[in-house]
Structure formats: structure tokens, C-alpha cells
Amino acid sequence: MRPLIAIVGRPNVGKSTLFNRIVGRRKAMVDDMPGVTRDRNYANVDRFDVPFILIDTGGFEPETNDRLLQQMREQSQLAMAEADVILFVMDGRDGLTPADVEVVEMLRRVDKPIFYLINKIDGDKQETAIGDFYTLGVDTIFTVSAEHNRGVNDLMDEVIKALPKGSAADTDEEVTKIAVIGRPNVGKSTLVNRLLGIERVVANPTPGTTRDSIDTYFTCNRKRYLLIDTAGIRRKGKTTEKIEKYSVVDSLRSIERADVVLIVIDAEEGVTEQDTKIAGYAYEAGRGCIFVVNKWDTLTKDNASMGKFIEKIRMEFKYLPFAPIVFVSAKTGQRLGKIMTEVDAVMEQFARRITTSDLNRVFSTATEEHHAPLYQGRRVKFYFATQVGTKPPSIVIFTNRPDGVHFSYERYIVNRFREAFGFTGTPMRLLFKGRESRKRA
């Protein structure tokens, strides 16, 4: 396992900017609105001598009556409990605050390496105006400017030295990456918390409470997974705030990172137009897909109700006939075990490779039983097929008229491959090439 480093501190002291600087890319949302990073956010960092996981937390307010800020405080405490090293960030422009002092007193009781940072120190003049911070009585204080990359490299040199030795980095290939997507407030965060057995993501009845995509590693039945709880994808017309627009982009990026996507649908509201668009993102990205119908416990059901809901999904999501459907209640835990069973099954098919001989046996039979329509009055001839990739399964078919294969015939070929080999839960990619490309296949 990679060692973990947690960044904690009051809201708006620059934690997310520091997170982005260390990661080397824009991973967390940065905005001037206090509390914009509501949950912990994880990123793998490989830029330094020791690979590690960096945790960005929501702002830490020691005493508050605001329920959301209280939840963010609890999440910060969980992050500190998980971490191997803690970076406590203070604001050099605001000066030392009573909240900073209270957090430092709490950190004194934590038995792990802690680095105290004064952020937003952009020059020597500011460096001389931070005397109050030295009254904290800590051994070393680092002055940095995360925005301008001042002092960050020196800080990281010392942080790397403090990381536990012998922590082997896990490669992405060893981990099944699962993205949880859906409209705001369909129960994604509650579902994630149930799967993990811990209040990992702030679950709040306010739609859009989860704004960033939140990453969590976990183990189930001796298999490792990375669970990505994405911000709810809203209609474009509703993403009026700059921060919400970035959340949609972040969710789409999370889909790109995933192997398997859980498409969460609200059983109470049924299938909406926005659900079909969200699922379309996953399909276009070529990810393994599973429908998770949540809040199934809230409906009055008869023996036919589940069948009717399945028919509705199949009708509205005609491009995903291969995706399994699981009916669950994240609130009660009903049928949640079925989700991981389906994830494993879909992942196996997502990464499946078929031998060229088996592929062509099915392909030849399919083309002989049903010829392709004529193209510009000429017959479309097929030569052979070969699988060139996985995740998703990708197959090249060599033909005399690569531009003459009708989409309906392409769908027919895909269906024949599915009948023979399964490929449950995963899209398939067919690429038609001219005969002259055969040697390059």
C-alpha cells in the first residue's frame, strides 16, 4: 500500500492549491468560497522518490454549529486517522487564529509526523510578519506559497523522508476502478458509505453536496478496488455556478478513469432524460456499466414491479442492453452484496481477450448466415477479425469496403459475438479496415 499524506487546516487557507501543486495537476476544485472542498479527496502522486497517496480535506473548524462544517470537521479527523503524515496549513495573511491554536493542541496528541505550514508567504516582507506563529511552540514551521510554488519542493523533501519505509506502490492494473455516477441526490454518497462501511463521503439532503470526485481504496474478498464517488451530473442549464460546472467536468474525467461505472437511478423518480445522458457519457467512454436502482425499499411493489422497471430501463437505454441491473437500498443495505458480485463479473468481461481462431469461427458463421447489405451496388467482403485491445474489448475486422458496413450490420456482428462469448456489462468496439492494413494488425 502507498503511504498516505493528509492536508488539513481551516477553510480557505489554501489546502486545495497546495494539493494541486503537489499532485502536479488540477485535481481538487479551488475557489474563494470557504468550504468549497467539502470531502476528503485522494490522488496518487508519483512525482517524488516515494509514491504516495495525497488526501485533501474540507476545512477544519474546531467549534461550529453549522451541520455541514461539523461533518467536514469529522471528515478531517478521519483523514488524520488514516494518514501516515499530516500537513497542517495555516494562512500567513490572516495571521494566527484561535482556531489554529486549538487544532495544534489537538495535533499534539497525534503520534505521527506532522508538518506545520504557513501558506500565502509570497516574499521576504511577509516572512518577517509571521512572528505570532512561533508562539505555538512547535519544532519547525515551513513557510510556503502554494500558488507561486515557493518553498513547496523544500517541504516535500522533508515530507518524503518522514514517510514509512517499505510501502510498495500498487499499480493501477492491480486495482479495479469503480466510478459512481448519477444525478444529484440519487443516493450515491450513501451507497458509497454503505459499501465501505464508514461515513466516507458527506451525505446531505442538499442536492450537489458532493462536489468533487472522491477516491477511496478498499479491499473486498481479497480484491482491491478504487471507488470514485462523483459529483452529481446536472443539466447544463442548472450548472450556473463556476464551481458546479467544474464538478461536471470532474465527473466526466472520473468516468474516463474508471473500469466499471455504477449508474445510480432513483427508484422513486424513475428514469429521467438526464439519466439517459449520464449513462451515455459512460457508454461513449467505453466503460463497463452496471445500473444500480437505488431507494427500492421506498416503493410499494408487487411481483411484476421489478420486471416493469427493467423493461423501462431497457427501453430508455437501448444502447446499453448488455448492462446488468441491480435493485438496492443504500439506506437499509438491501442487496448491496450483489453490486460487488456484478462488478467482478463485468470487470472480467471488460478485460477479456478472445483468441483469433475462436473469434473467426464465430465471425465466419455470422457472415455466412447473414450477408452484409450491398454498398453502392457492390458486395461487402470480409476477410478476418482479430482482437487488438481490451478495456473495452476492441476488434478489428478487415474488409474490402471499410466505409460500406451499415451500422445495423455492425450491431448484428456485435450481438453474435456477445451470444458466443458473453461480454456482459462491457461495450465492444469494432473497427473496419481495408485489406491493405492486414499486415499492420
Curated annotation (Swiss-Prot):
Keywords: GTP-binding, Nucleotide-binding, Repeat, Ribosome biogenesis. PANTHER family: GTPASE DER. Associates with the 50S ribosomal subunit. GTP 1 binds at residues 9-16, 56-60, 119-122. GTP 2 binds at residues 182-189, 229-233, 294-297. CDD domains: EngA1, EngA2. It comes from Geotalea uraniireducens (strain Rf4) (Geobacter uraniireducens). The lineage of its organism: Bacteria, Pseudomonadati, Thermodesulfobacteriota, Desulfuromonadia, Geobacterales. Coiled coil: none annotated. GTPase that plays an essential role in the late steps of ribosome biogenesis. It comes from the Bacteria. Residues 3-167, 176-351 form the EngA-type G domain. One of its GO terms (molecular function) is ribosome binding. This is GTPase Der. InterPro entries: G_ENGA, GTP-bd, GTPase_Der, KH_dom-like, KH_dom-like_a/b, P-loop_NTPase, Small_GTP-bd. GO terms for biological process: ribosome biogenesis. Residues 352-436 form the KH-like domain.
